[in-house]
């Protein structure tokens, strides 16, 4: 076998491989003999059919099959010999393939980039300094009360924090448009659900009031036919309701299954907030470390890996919305390409950190991660046992631990300082 390696643009490589004719003919002859021995032919006893007849009937098909198998096998031998690490499946192209002649074929593929980490000492990370304060707990309790609130008719004007039930009809240049009409539409004021200017027109109005407002649809509005258009809405206020909050008492506490009355609920809420805060701090530090790593290391990315990641993201998107990945229409690549490339880059760079630092998943860290995750469940012991009894889940947690260790290795060389945050300030920066 002869092999030549050609370096194309970027990460693309082309191997040209020559396989001696004798190898091909031996493989073709062996397969034809196998067919003659094991298949039945009309007019002949099994295994007694003339080889010329078998070759005439099956020769070309066998030769094509042999070519495919030979190209795959010799490609693998070639990349092992040349110490090449392909990043995806090759594209084979026969250059010369005729009976009695050497097989010459090319294999085009991409390789993984050679990553030489740099600039870790220029990565800037601000560690959040934050705690759960009494006022944060009080605000969370108020949120829980709002979640359990009811609405009651009131002789009041619509304002932020009230709920207005309205009928409306929208028109553009005097013509009603699709989706611009509703009856008994509940609108919680101050939530920003409607286009700019819509709620402003309703503020100060009471049940029975009728009005017409002029608004403009935003240029980025989701409906193409409405983007940037001026519209009029005829609105009738059916009713205005005030929010009624439940008392913070034992009856309210019972809805959440907390023990120890109001103080017990406060303690449980604080505990949950502190757990979420610890994760948010970890996420914020990790985000900065990885962003810095990516900014300091510009690498080529194999398109084959991006393609694979796009497909993963597509499937996740379909599943997230309750669809079937096999039957759902294929979502546009553009929706996922940027995120897919980012994930591939991060994976390659973190992989190089792990390799260069010779990191192995720390068993104690794996155990701590499982315990931390399990603490959010009603029976943590049961969750821990489930993980420890499932090798796939354990491997997932080992990968998480290894990634955290890689981030710690980056932080050890980075410029790390501290920055004060409020609870809500930090939590609002977390991805949805």
Swiss-Prot record:
Q: Which InterPro entries match?
A: PPIase_dom_sf, PPIase_FKBP_dom, Trig_fac, Trigger_fac_C, Trigger_fac_C_sf, Trigger_fac_ribosome-bd_bac, Trigger_fac_ribosome-bd_sf, Trigger_fact/SurA_dom_sf
Q: Which UniProt keywords apply?
A: Cell cycle, Cell division, Chaperone, Cytoplasm, Isomerase, Rotamase
Main EC class of this protein?
Answer: isomerase
Which positions make up the signal peptide? none
Query: What are the recorded GO MF terms, alphabetically?
Result: peptidyl-prolyl cis-trans isomerase activity; protein folding chaperone; ribosome binding
Where in or outside the cell it occurs: the entry states: Cytoplasm
Main localization category: cytoplasm
- Spell out the reaction equation it catalyses: [protein]-peptidylproline (omega=180) = [protein]-peptidylproline (omega=0)
What top-level branch of life does the organism fall under? Answer: Bacteria
Q: Which GO terms describe its biological process?
A: 'de novo' cotranslational protein folding; cell division; chaperone-mediated protein folding; protein transport; protein unfolding
- The record's EC number reads 5.2.1.8
> Can the keyword Protease be found in this entry's annotation?
no
Output the Pfam families linked to this UniProt entry: FKBP_C, Trigger_C, Trigger_N
Quote a single Gene Ontology cellular component term. cytoplasm
PPIase FKBP-type domain ranges (all copies): 161-246
Q: Does the keyword Lyase apply?
A: no
UniProt function note: Involved in protein export. Acts as a chaperone by maintaining the newly synthesized protein in an open conformation. Functions as a peptidyl-prolyl cis-trans isomerase.
Provide the domain comment: Consists of 3 domains; the N-terminus binds the ribosome, the middle domain has PPIase activity, while the C-terminus has intrinsic chaperone activity on its own.
Q: Which family does it belong to?
A: Belongs to the FKBP-type PPIase family. Tig subfamily.
What's the name of the protein?
Answer: Trigger factor
């Amino acid at each position: 076998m002869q092999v030549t390696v050609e370096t194309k643009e970027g990460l693309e490589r082309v191997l040209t491989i020559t396989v001696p004719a004798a190898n091909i003919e031996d493989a073709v002859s062996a397969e034809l003999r196998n067919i003659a021995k094991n298949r039945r032919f009309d007019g002949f006893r099994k295994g007694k059919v003339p080889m010329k007849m078998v070759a005439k009937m099956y020769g070309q098909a066998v030769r094509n099959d042999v070519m495919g198998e030979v190209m795959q096998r010799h490609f693998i031998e070639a990349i092992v010999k040349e110490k090449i690490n392909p990043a995806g499946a090759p594209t084979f192209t026969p250059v010369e393939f005729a009976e009695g002649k050497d097989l010459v074929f090319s294999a085009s593929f991409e390789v993984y980039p050679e990553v030489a980490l740099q600039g870790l000492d220029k990565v800037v990370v601000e560690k959040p300094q934050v705690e759960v304060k009494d006022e944060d707990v009080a605000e969370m309790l108020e949120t829980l009360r709002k979640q359990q609130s009811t609405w009651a008719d009131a002789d009041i004007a619509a304002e932020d924090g009230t709920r207005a039930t309205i009928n409306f009809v929208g028109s553009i240049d005097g013509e009603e448009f699709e989706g611009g009409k509703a009856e008994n539409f509940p609108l919680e004021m101050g939530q920003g659900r409607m286009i700019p200017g819509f709620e402003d027109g309703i503020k100060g109005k009471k049940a029975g009031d009728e009005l017409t407002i002029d608004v403009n649809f935003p240029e980025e509005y989701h409906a193409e036919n409405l983007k940037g258009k001026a519209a009029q809405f005829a609105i009738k206020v059916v009713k205005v309701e005030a929010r009624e909050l439940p008392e913070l008492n034992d009856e309210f506490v019972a809805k959440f299954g907390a023990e120890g009355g109001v103080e017990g609920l406060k303690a449980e809420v604080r505990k949950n907030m502190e757990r979420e805060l610890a994760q948010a701090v970890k996420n914020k530090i990790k985000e900065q470390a990885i962003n810095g790593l990516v900014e300091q290391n510009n690498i080529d990315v194999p398109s084959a890996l991006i393609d694979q990641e796009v497909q993963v993201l597509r499937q996740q998107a379909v599943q997230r919305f309750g669809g079937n990945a096999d039957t759902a229409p294929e979502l546009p690549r553009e929706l996922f390409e940027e995120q897919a490339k980012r994930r591939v880059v991060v994976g390659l760079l973190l992989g190089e950190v792990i390799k260069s630092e010779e990191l192995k998943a720390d068993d104690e860290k794996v155990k701590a991660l499982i315990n931390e995750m399990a603490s959010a469940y009603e029976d943590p012991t049961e969750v821990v046992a489930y993980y420890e009894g499932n090798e796939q889940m354990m491997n997932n947690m080992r990968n998480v631990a290894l990634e955290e260790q890689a981030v710690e290795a980056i932080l050890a060389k980075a410029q790390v300082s501290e920055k004060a945050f409020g609870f809500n300030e930090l939590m609002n920066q977390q991805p949805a």
